Amino acid sequence: MAQKTFTVTADSGIHARPATTLVQAASKFDSDINLEFNGKTVNLKSIMGVMSLGIQKGATITISAEGSDEADALAALEDTMSKEGLGE
């Protein structure tokens, strides 16, 4: 399993648009990809799951991937977080 922790830097946190961007990026991979926030873990391929967390600016989140393309998935999601200005 590969994982990376981020601090959310987007002013509006992870609301509908950024959640959709992350879900689309995660859905390209076969690995199981999860997002953990505040003790809750959701499937990062589920828009409703991600939005249900109510992630605000300054929050610490962990994205984990497990499967045949886990390293590629995590690298792509890290790139998405950075390019979209969502976190670091």
UniProtKB/Swiss-Prot annotation:
* UniProt note on regulation of activity: Phosphorylation on Ser-46 inhibits the phosphoryl transfer from enzyme I to HPr.
GO CC terms: cytoplasm
PROSITE patterns according to UniProt = PTS_HPR_DOM (PS51350), PTS_HPR_HIS (PS00369), PTS_HPR_SER (PS00589)
Q: Which residue ranges does the record assign to the HPr domain?
A: 1-88
* One annotated GO biological process: phosphoenolpyruvate-dependent sugar phosphotransferase system
Q: Which residues form a coiled coil?
A: none
Q: Quote the function comment for this protein.
A: General (non sugar-specific) component of the phosphoenolpyruvate-dependent sugar phosphotransferase system (sugar PTS). This major carbohydrate active-transport system catalyzes the phosphorylation of incoming sugar substrates concomitantly with their translocation across the cell membrane. The phosphoryl group from phosphoenolpyruvate (PEP) is transferred to the phosphoryl carrier protein HPr by enzyme I. Phospho-HPr then transfers it to the PTS EIIA domain. P-Ser-HPr interacts with the catabolite control protein A (CcpA), forming a complex that binds to DNA at the catabolite response elements cre, operator sites preceding a large number of catabolite-regulated genes. Thus, P-Ser-HPr is a corepressor in carbon catabolite repression (CCR), a mechanism that allows bacteria to coordinate and optimize the utilization of available carbon sources. P-Ser-HPr also plays a role in inducer exclusion, in which it probably interacts with several non-PTS permeases and inhibits their transport activity.
Q: Which NCBIfam families match?
A: PRK13780.1, PTS_HPr_family
Q: What's the name of the protein?
A: Phosphocarrier protein HPr
Q: Organism source for this protein?
A: Priestia megaterium
